[in-house]
Amino acid sequence: MARYVLVILFLTTECFVENRTINYCAADVSPKTHRHKLHPSATMPSSDPENPSRPRLEASPELMEELAAASELLEKANPIEVIRWASERFKKRLTMATAFGPEGCLILHWLSSVAPDTFVFNLETGYQFKETLELRDRIRDRYGITVSYESPETTVEEYERRHGGPLYRTDPATCCGDRKIVVIERVLSNFDAWMSGIRRDQSPDRADAPIVGWDKKFGVVKISPLANWTKSQVWDLILQENVPYNPLHDKGYVSIGCWPCTRAITDGEDERAGRWSGSEKTECGLHLRD
């Protein structure tokens, strides 16, 4: 159930979730820009501290109904409200994955004001650009959020030795599966919900992404605060708020992943054309449509 009351410049939204009332006040999507104190590094919970025996969420009809209602309500909310809802709803059972793309950096900009103790992680495959890895330190210095590197069990050297060379050249799907999917499955097993920076206009696989929905692949709730935003909206606010971003974006790299499978694109090419160029592969498997 939702009720909207417009008072001067503020929109108050009242929604009922799990018999709790959550109020939002929306004014500006831009929190004050300032340097935040360094927060204690968020740790990955092995269980709910308030209820150690608490099981993970199940895709019950009641939960599906709740998520659908929340997604419909938050479709017209600004991203800060979405993040606030997610933090209030899932608390320590909420995490965020980021590849330090522009959308992820913008969400971190907001997260530092709304829920700075959220556990944030990056899938460190061993093949990321040095510019991407250096951005982690800039994010930490600016916002006080230390992004945790989550890596595969085998190093790049061990992995390539096991497969007789770089697997990304011959079987990029398996490489992504081993060095990304297996890792995120391990991380998300400790949480009930995760946030991502995907946008609907990035690719056909993402075109139907809800603001809030059930992620069948990983068995958790998935929140995408920027699902209904455009590339220009993201970059306008990044430049306006001086949000740190990967300098490779200034060199024609629009979508940035592992260096062996990423190239700069030219005018007129699809936003993700620089990923796995020359193959039919367009996604690593994290955000494939059900």
Language-model features, listed with the residues they occupy:
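Ala/Thr-enriched low-complexity intrinsically disordered regions
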Residues: A2, T12-T13, T21, A26-A27, ...
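Nucleotide-activated chemistry modules centered on ATP-dependent adenylation/adenylyltransferase
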Residues: L6, F10-L11, C15, R35-D290
